[in-house]
Amino acid sequence: MPGVYLEESDNFDVALRRFKKQVEKSGILSELKKRQHFEKPSVMRKKKKAAARKRLLKKMRKINMM
């Protein structure tokens, strides 16, 4: 669980920015969006395959550029 400890000299805006960065890094918001609606296992598999294909094509393009 992300948390930020403030000192007396810390600015609130800086602390808020650090907290947002920790939340983003931990993946809480993306997990929340993913779980907001039920997704059938078949749809999850399709998305996973599509993401893998996209990564592979990106890697192939990068290799061909060299």
Swiss-Prot record:
Q: Which NCBIfam families match?
A: S21p
Q: Which UniProt keywords apply?
A: Ribonucleoprotein, Ribosomal protein
* Native organism taxonomy: Bacteria, Pseudomonadati, Thermodesulfobacteriota, Desulfovibrionia, Desulfovibrionales
A single Gene Ontology CC annotation of this entry is: ribosome
Q: Tell me the protein's name.
A: Small ribosomal subunit protein bS21
User: Its family?
Assistant: Belongs to the bacterial ribosomal protein bS21 family.
Matching Gene3D superfamilies = Ribosomal protein S8
Which InterPro entries does this one have? Answer: Ribosomal_bS21, Ribosomal_bS21_CS, Ribosomal_bS21_sf
- List the source organism: Solidesulfovibrio magneticus (strain ATCC 700980 / DSM 13731 / RS-1) (Desulfovibrio magneticus)
Q: Among the record's GO biological process terms, what is one?
A: translation
* Keyword Chloroplast recorded: no
**Pfam families named among the record's database cross-references:** Ribosomal_S21
Q: What molecular functions are annotated in GO for this chain?
A: structural constituent of ribosome
